Amino acid sequence: LKAERVESGFHVERASFTVSLPSKLKGKYDMAIANFGVPLYGATLVGSFKYPKTDQDGCAEFDANAFNTNSSYGANIMLLNRGECPFTTKAFFAQKAGAEAVIIVDNIAEDLITMDAADDAESQEYVKNISVPVALITESVGEKFEEELSAGNAVIATLNWTDVLPHPDSRVEYEIWTELTDSCGAKCDAQVGFLNDWAPIAKELETKNYTQFTPHYLTWSCPEGYEDSDVCLSECINHGRYCIPDPDDDLYSGYSGADVVVSNLRALCAFKAANDSQIPTKWWDYITEFQSSCKMSTGLFNSYDCAETSMKRAGLDTSSWKNCIGDIDANSENAMMEEQIIAQSPPSESTRSSVRILPTVVINDVQYRGKLARGEVLKAICAGFPNDLRPEMCSDSGLINDKCAQGADGWNTCLSDPDKSGETTCSTTSAFPYYECICPKGLHSEFSDSLNTWSCVSVQQTARSVGKTSTVLASVFFSLLVLVTCLFLFYRWKMKQVMNQEIRGILSQYMPLDDDEMEEEEDTARLNAGNDSSSIRLGRSGSPTAMFG
């Protein structure tokens, strides 16, 4: 029997803010970091609170006079009431109206809670576009600020994320908790996209010994006595020990929860194989290959052969991998899955928080809150280093900021102008390498064989080039047409000569022909050949003497 243990529970990740004005509200307050938006890890933000005159729940677009965004007190920090619509809707409309941070006031007398985004497509679309920090404060604290702001008084505060993440040493340890399902809509698409986007950064950080990464997957156990139920048989492996909810909510068709557990287990064992090989970054090669080749939509998600092929392409040993996976039908524990249960639900004496939200990033044992995106997660990881030990990637010229900034990779590649045309420009993108070289208005990309690269050419130049090319092509076409016509006429003349010789040879077998008669017969043959392509009539009486098919 398993021993009962007390879990540490879910921790609300907090930051703080300090009010400097008015004096009666002066002090330090806690705020709960939302699981979306962009917390400014390692930084502070000074500004003034704004409270809209109407639509104080922020569930619709604000009109131009809702609040004054022109402030001499720094950033615009929007204060909104909880309720009536999702948190993501409030944050998006506030940001659109000019807010540089959003604070939502709870409408229930309770402790701080973590705000999360819903799984529906609209909420996930908002999540992708929210680029400001979002947090929640308690009802009692928020009412004080709303009262002061409604009276027309200013409230000046400094939001602080500098001490959110600990930085105990020169190496940051982080975990990524995801799920391998790829058919749950926008949320799954975002997770798959993030892992592919993050892979090159993770490999570089790990190779240079800046970080130590560990992948994790959530699991749950079937309640005792229900191991043989339809639910547990479909969603669990190892006799109900490790389960995941059915990905399509259909126990009797499609992929099962057990399929997902097995895929997660294979990924965990791939990570073990990568560590055993002394090249842990090979796990990223496995997971990106698996996500690309073994999709649910292609019917290969639960294919052992597909997963094994991904292992081989990543250069990992498959024999130890098979042993690690073990017998999923056995009524026994699996060491890799037991590690997941302990990590997601630490004992009460642990300082770690239980993992309950997917996806979750844990940095130095503290759960990251915010948008699951390359730049935002990198900023948080960089905040986990001591200031004097941060890798170059965390600097202004690193991946953390604009890749088209002067001195960055994009600038060096695009604006350094390898073709000396002075026309190439750089644009940032959301996917690795996070920039692309594009052409300004009036120009288009054209490949240079001599430079083996793309460069920008004006549309007018292209038009002239196209015009010249068209003229040359027209001349060539006309010449070919004349040549074909001449060849056709020569062919017809030659065929007539051959036909005349054959006619003369045949007629000579029946009657002697002098030259005049032969010419007459030839004229008759030519005339009749023109009237009937399938036969030639000969003889003075008009009776058929020969027929040619």
What do the predicted segments below correspond to?
Residues 384-548:
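Conserved N-terminal segment of EGF-like repeats
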Residues 73-77, 97-101, 170-174, 207-213, ...:
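Loop/turn elements at helix/coil->beta-strand transitions in domains of secreted/extracellular proteins
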Residues 2-188, 217:
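Structured lumen-facing ectodomains of secretory-pathway proteins
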Residues 61, 186, 190, 224, ...:
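Disulfide-rich extracellular modules and peptides
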Residues 184-207:
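Typically the conserved alpha-helix immediately C-terminal to a functionally engaged Cys/Sec
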Residues 50, 78, 85, 91, ...:
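Extracellular/luminal ectodomains of secreted and membrane glycoproteins with large N-terminal domains
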